[in-house]
Design a protein with these regions (language model features):
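Conserved helicase NTPase catalytic core signature
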Residues: 2-91
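Conserved helicase motor core of SF1/SF2 NTP-dependent helicases
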Residues: 3, 8-10, 14-15, 78-367
């Protein structure tokens, strides 16, 4: 791919050697300018002016030829405003990951195209807006979302998915995609262990784990739940077989919506010598860190456990959709059911797993 980048194509152009020589000459003249007399400086400046004019002339010539020949140009939305694309028009503009693109950024590129195709999933992560006031003002409402809401007839859903076991897929399909997703035959029944249950909820309620709020941040942590997750991971690796995990490079994703929980889990993994051979196969990250990725096994620590049913930004269901759909063959959710199931989404998810997977009390893993 590097050979097709703008920089590499530019450097491969027949006129680049002359341009490089001119740039070198400019640098040499500039470095020696202070040492020259007044008259010599004037001569040098005149030469610099001519060299710079010729360098600009060559740059424009190379750019024009490169982009005249190009059938496809790939760039960021903001990058489409680069001077090399000035006054250029394109038949079709594809905006990938459009659900994460700010509308204002989209319009930078849209003005250069006759038609636009937005590709993405507005049921997954939105753009990152650091200013709360801007988000409340609508900056986090993307162009893709607006089109989906106002012109649903223009939307096409890619219905066949090639990642997940069907039991993992069915719930997000039902909740987010009008039950329209289908599994490709080669992944429909994929699994690691024979007779294994693809979807499991490990209910922490009976263990009375407690969430904590860190003093220096808004983040939450549930240390006992993190310890249970790591213990459960070890048991599952042992169940599969250590050699098989290494031979087949079976990989594991440990996800939590809370950064503090992720950091605590990473520390537990790092300090436990059992995981040393498997560390390259284990990734612990927030939901945002897993966007666009997938793992054979996904374990999710939901953290929240309180008497009032407060779940904070677990209520952003787009993040949960991302977390759930990262798994290829095994999905394990660790969470306090009485706290979480006060929310309609988690109630239905819990009931789905009860009926189609397996709900296990934490007592079986801590005894």
């Amino acid at each position: 791919m590097l050979s097709f980048t703008y920089e590499r194509r530019f450097e491969s152009h027949p006129d680049y050697a002359e341009l490089w020589g001119i740039r070198k000459a400019i640098r040499e003249i500039q470095s020696n300018l202070r040492k020259k007399s007044h008259g010599e400086k004037e001569t040098a400046r005149n030469r610099l002016s001519r060299l710079r004019f010729r360098a600009t002339e060559l740059e424009v010539k190379i750019d024009t030829e490169l982009f005249d020949e190009a059938r496809v140009v790939a760039c960021t939305l903001v990058g489409s405003a680069n001077r090399v694309l000035t006054n250029r028009n394109f038949t079709t503009l594809f905006i990938d990951e459009a659900a994460q693109a700010l509308e204002a950024a989209c319009w930078i590129a849209i003005g250069k195209a006759d038609r636009v195709i937005l590709a993405g999933d507005h049921h997954q992560l939105p753009p990152t807006i650091k200013c709360i006031e801007a988000a409340r003002g609508g900056l986090d409402h993307t162009l893709m979302q607006k089109i989906t809401d106002r012109k649903p007839e223009t939307v096409s859903l890619l219905k066949t998915q090639y990642r997940m076991n069907e039991d993992i897929m069915r719930f997000p399909s039902r909740w987010f995609y009008h039950d329209e997703l289908q599994s490709a035959p080669e992944v429909k029944h994929r699994g690691i262990l024979e007779f294994d249950t693809p979807v499991v909820w490990l209910d922490t309620a009976d263990c009375h784990f407690e969430e904590d709020r860190l003093d220096d941040s808004m983040s939450r942590i549930n240390r006992d739940e993190a310890t249970l997750l790591v213990s459960t991971l070890q048991k599952y690796i042992e169940k599969i077989g250590k050699e098989r995990v290494l031979d087949e490079s079976i990989d594991f994703g440990l996800i939590s919506p809370y950064k503090s929980q992720v950091q605590y889990i990473r520390g537990l993994i790092k300090r436990d010598t059992f995981f040393k051979p498997f560390r390259r196969l284990i990734t612990a990250h927030t939901v945002d860190g897993f966007q666009g990725q997938e793992r054979d096994v996904i374990m999710i620590s939901l953290v929240r456990a309180n008497d009032k049913g407060r779940i904070g930004f677990l209520g952003d269901l787009r993040r949960m959709n991302v977390a759930i759909t990262r798994a290829r063959m095994k999905l394990m959710i660790l969470g306090d059911a009485p706290t979480l199931t006060r929310h309609a989404f988690y109630k239905e998810l819990y009931e789905y797993i009860w009926e189609n997977g397996q709900v296990i009390t934490c007592l079986l893993y801590t005894s």
